[in-house]
């Protein structure tokens, strides 16, 4: 019990005070503006950079000093005159600064933990999203069951505020957070709609990503705690950690829930072969043990979401499937375990018998249908996968057109080169290659046959065939047999920090 008290005291020591005064500092908005100039490719342009200036910020801070109307309740936001004439611009600027401020204590916590563990340099080297696939190849081939779980989001925004309140202790700070959230949804509603999530994520993507990541991090911290302490964690200690905010109000309910499902006082089991992977809004839970243990973890997840986050999750929405019979999607790939059966004849003295050997291999396949649908939406082909020209690029020079297609082809080839079957990847490259030729022919007002005859098809298409070979030749010796073998095998590039937008198109 003493160990868990130390854990809770350490968590409470991370609480940060006095974040609200930082909103009155000009350099905070300068950081937000600098971030917008160097905006990540994940985020869309919110379209107010041309209206942002130091003069606007100074006037805004002056109004914030003169009118202390930020410290209000969400229900009074309609009566608040603080926003002035340009409510959208003022709200946008302050929310961007708010997103910078709210990240400060957690960035300090992350950097300190990395420095203490002396893994800062290795952390930088392991940021590649491809680094997860070698792990899956090593581990998943020995597992038997997998559960593909969609992480539910809180049905009410107050839950997010309450979770964050445990880590940051600044009342005006949370009044302002409620004000921002109230501007984008109906606070009195019991359900947070997907329409609101889409609107909020586009208006302030930095703050939205922070709130979402913090919610996921909070639930995963509890899951990791349960996982590491599962061998000796009793129900009483678990309930103390589980209900950090409203423990006494919910303890009786928790006991009824858990004792209803289990006929003995709850003791966590030791499962050394469970693996957890999260990607976007989904997580994958895989184990070598029987489905009984997977069902245990399934109920733990459901009770965790319901009792701690007040999120209702249907048990039937979490399916447990044999890994050899179920394929799942991860990082733009389709993954499944293929069983290779072979029969070996063995002889012992005068007796001869056959032994069946089953070897599991992890197949990582390019999702050809979603990619063709994405290429069709981008006007590179039709829905059947037949290449078409892209007239909107016809105003560019021939070099720019070829360079654009080559860049897309190189990125897709670079990302999907870890596929176990390259046939689908070659089809995507063929679509882009022929679409490039049709675009050039459209620009020169000629047919494809006449354009290739005039310009020379071998020189034009050579770059599409050789660009990946040139990349590999920089890493491995230029040997034809070596390069051919590499083209057939999986190659995971550890410099890929994001997946292409075509991967996520639906």
Swiss-Prot record:
One of its GO terms (biological process) is RNA splicing. It holds the Pfam family MatK_N. One of its GO terms (molecular function) is RNA binding. InterPro entries: Domain_X, Maturase_MatK, Maturase_MatK_N. GO terms for cellular component: chloroplast. Its main location: plastid. The keyword Transit peptide does not apply. It comes from the Eukaryota. Keywords: Chloroplast, mRNA processing, Plastid, RNA-binding, tRNA processing. It is found in: Plastid, Chloroplast. Usually encoded in the trnK tRNA gene intron. Probably assists in splicing its own and other chloroplast group II introns. Belongs to the intron maturase 2 family. MatK subfamily. This is Maturase K. The lineage of its organism: Eukaryota, Viridiplantae, Streptophyta, Embryophyta, Tracheophyta.
């Amino acid at each position: 019990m003493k160990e868990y008290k130390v854990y809770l005291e350490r968590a409470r020591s991370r609480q940060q005070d006095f974040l609200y005064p930082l909103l009155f500092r000009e350099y905070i908005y300068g950081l937000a503006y600098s971030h917008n100039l160097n905006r990540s490719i994940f985020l869309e342009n919110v379209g107010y950079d041309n209206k942002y200036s130091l003069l606007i910020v100074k006037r805004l801070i002056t109004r914030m000093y003169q009118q202390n109307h930020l410290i209000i309740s969400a229900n009074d936001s309609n009566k608040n005159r603080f926003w002035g004439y340009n409510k959208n611009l003022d709200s946008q600027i302050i929310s961007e600064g708010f997103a910078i401020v709210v990240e400060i204590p957690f960035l300090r916590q992350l950097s300190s933990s990395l420095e203490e563990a002396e893994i800062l340099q290795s952390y930088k080297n392991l940021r590649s999203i491809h680094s997860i696939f070698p792990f899956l190849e090593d581990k998943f081939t020995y597992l038997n069951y997998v559960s593909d779980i969609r992480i539910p989001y809180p049905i009410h925004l107050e839950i997010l505020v309450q979770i964050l309140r445990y880590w940051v202790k600044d009342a005006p700070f949370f009044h302002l957070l409620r004000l921002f959230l109230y501007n984008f949804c109906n606070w009195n509603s019991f359900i947070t709609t997907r329409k609101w999530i889409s609107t909020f994520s586009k208006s302030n993507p930095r703050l939205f990503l922070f709130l979402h990541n913090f919610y996921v991090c909070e639930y995963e911290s509890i899951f990791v705690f349960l996982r590491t302490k599962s061998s000796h964690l009793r129900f009483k200690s678990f309930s103390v950690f589980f209900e950090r905010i409203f423990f006494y109000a919910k303890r009786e309910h928790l006991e009824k829930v858990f004792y209803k499902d289990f006929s003995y006082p709850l003791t966590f089991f030791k499962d050394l072969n469970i693996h957890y992977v999260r990607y976007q809004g989904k997580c994958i839970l895989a184990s070598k043990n029987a489905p009984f243990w997977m069902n245990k973890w399934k109920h733990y997840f459901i009770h965790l979401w319901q009792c701690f986050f007040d999120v209702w999750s249907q048990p039937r929405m979490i399916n447990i499937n044999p890994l050899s019979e179920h394929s799942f999607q991860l990082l733009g790939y389709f993954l499944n375990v293929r069983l290779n059966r072979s029969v070996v004849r063995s002889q012992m003295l005068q007796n001869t018998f056959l032994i069946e050997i089953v070897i599991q291999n992890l197949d990582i396949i390019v999702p050809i249908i979603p990619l063709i649908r994405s290429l069709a939406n981008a006007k590179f082909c039709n829905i059947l996968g037949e290449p078409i020209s892209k007239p909107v690029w016809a105003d560019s020079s021939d070099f720019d057109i070829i360079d654009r297609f080559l860049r897309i082809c190189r990125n897709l080839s670079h990302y999907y080169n870890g596929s176990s079957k390259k046939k689908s990847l070659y089809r995507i490259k063929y679509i882009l290659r022929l679409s490039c030729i049709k675009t050039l022919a459209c620009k020169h007002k000629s047919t494809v046959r006449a354009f290739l005859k005039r310009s020379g098809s071998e020189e034009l298409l050579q770059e599409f065939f050789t660009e990946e070979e040139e990349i590999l030749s920089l890493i491995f010796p230029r040997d034809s047999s070596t390069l051919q073998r590499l083209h057939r095998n999986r190659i995971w590039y550890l410099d890929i920090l994001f997946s292409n937008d075509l991967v996520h198109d639906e």
